[in-house]
């Protein structure tokens, strides 16, 4: 079953994105490059606890 996760910018700490993931299939923490509106550039966003 998919659970909701929050993606946080690693540079400024802004939490701009919500996503879903299946934690049984992918137990590791997700990290994606996304656009950060605060920094106004593409930065690495990681899954929060």
UniProtKB/Swiss-Prot annotation:
The gene is rpmG2. SUPFAM superfamilies: Zn-binding ribosomal proteins. Pfam families: Ribosomal_L33 (PF00471). InterPro entries: Ribosomal_bL33 (IPR001705), Ribosomal_bL33_CS (IPR018264), Ribosomal_bL33_sf (IPR038584), Ribosomal_zn-bd (IPR011332). Belongs to the bacterial ribosomal protein bL33 family. This is Large ribosomal subunit protein bL33B. One of its GO terms (molecular function) is structural constituent of ribosome. The keyword Cytoplasm does not apply. It comes from the Bacteria. NCBIfam families: PRK00504.1, PRK00595.1, rpmG_bact. One of its GO terms (cellular component) is ribosome. Signal peptide: none annotated. Keywords: Ribonucleoprotein, Ribosomal protein.
